[in-house]
């Protein structure tokens, strides 16, 4: 148990020091232009995200994103009218999400962000009260030490009508191949 806590603390420190996609823009840090450039690059590199997420289909619906990072997909759900709830293990990423809301003038929209562990989602009392229409996670859960526990927690927060959309990177994918041969972890930069 102590070893697992140490590993989790190392994971949290890693993502706090270099939130995912943080270096994908040369624009003024945390400006709207900065976030626009990050969004443009994300959806250029992974254009399938928009179809997978179907951001526009969740107007007025409750969406939980597990592993929201710096909020690129969060903003799309929020702009399309979702009641959005995002959780990430990195407190730095959550701070950036909140700044991003301000940059897009979306602070008054229904959006709540939490720092937390996906292996203990149901411990967040705020989430237990909500009936989620969508639980979404893109490229996150395979980074957790106990992915099975994350799935169990997601199941606890779902109902019979909840849509669950989870994307995990395949070990033998083109993306992983390119990262391996270049020894470059672009996604975490």
Language-model segments: residues:
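N-terminal, positively charged/glycine-rich alpha-helical extensions of SAM-dependent methyltransferases
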Residues: 1-36
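Conserved alpha-helix/loop element of class I SAM-dependent methyltransferases that forms part
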Residues: 32-61
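Class I SAM-dependent methyltransferase SAM/SAH-binding core
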Residues: 61-66, 70-121
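Short conserved loop adjoining the S-adenosyl-L-methionine
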Residues: 120-129
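A conserved beta-strand element that flanks and buttresses the S-adenosyl-L-methionine
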Residues: 136
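Short catalytic micro-motifs in class I SAM-dependent methyltransferases
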Residues: 139-140
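A short glycine-rich, Lys/Arg-flanked "PGG" loop and its adjoining helix->strand segment in the class I
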Residues: 148-163
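Conserved class I S-adenosyl-L-methionine
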Residues: 163-188
